[in-house]
Amino acid sequence: MTRMRAVIVTFAVVFASIAADEARTADKMKLAVGQCGNWDSSQIELGTRIGAYARYGVELEALCTQGTGETQQAVIAGSADIGIGVGTLGAIGAFAKGAPIRIVAGSATGNADFWIVKADSPLKGVNDATSAHTVAYSTNGSSTHSVVLGFIRELGLKAKPIATGGPAATLTLAMSGQVDIGWTSPPLGFDLLDEGKIRIFARANDVPSLRGQTVRVNIANAESLKARRDAHVRFMQGFREVIDWMYSDPKALDMYADYRKTSLRNAARMRDEFFAKSALDPDSVKGMDALMVEGVNFKYLAKPLTPEELREFVQVPLR
């Protein structure tokens, strides 16, 4: 009996040691997350809270950024393995210039962002704005930049584009009159709309060419992807799992409302009215041909990428 106990204890120690080793050897991945708090970038925070990535042996260290420019630079420099929510146009332009990045997932197809004016603004719609007015976007090459360029190219907007950073900072600038037409991403701005302090000037999906485009993507540092591909694949397994959970478990909205410091009503309104699950599909990137034409027109690209370059650049789905 004593001998059996000794054997059992020995096995327990061995298994405990193995478990401890596995915990210690979880792959640590650094992420740069654009516009933290947006529904389409919240897979990182929410997934960490429910242990989705840990189940696949991945430990995340996330840094919030103000948008595409900061996110992309962190990945290019190698200070982040993955960038979340990068404007597709900006990513294409950077790759064409030799940046060591690869697209590893779609982040947002279509666009839930909307542009606002103060309630007392004389601007009622796109045709009312002149070259004396300003219109906000986050950073160069971002999805909001693509939208503003689309407003100008396809809807005839004449306002002057100006980079204003994230939605919270932009709302402050719009409410103080420092920019005429601001932008925001739901649920930020819902309360001001309900209180009658702002009006919707235009929606991103008003631009016909953008409705079916993947306007934001997730990118990886090319060297990190090459050296640690298995860890990247396991991260994506967790990422997909989180998206499924966000649309199937009522607790997801409660957790998001807590994370975003908003009401459950606003969280539900945002998801159900602005973000169909298909918009967050990580395993497709749509509209690349049109985006490359846009990139050439606005001088992000000298010429479209070749089919060979696209195959190297877009590694979706990552499995």
Positions of predicted regions on the chain:
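Pocket-lining segment of extracytoplasmic ligand-binding domains
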Residues: 89, 168-258
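Secondary-structure end/capping motifs
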Residues: 226-302
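Short, solvent-exposed loop/beta-turn-alpha elements that line the ligand-binding surface or hinge
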Residues: 55, 206-211, 276-284
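Bacterial N-terminal signal peptides
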Residues: 7-17
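Conserved C-terminal helix/tail region of periplasmic/extracytoplasmic solute-binding proteins
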Residues: 295-319
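N-terminal secretory signal peptides that target proteins for export/translocation
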Residues: 1-4
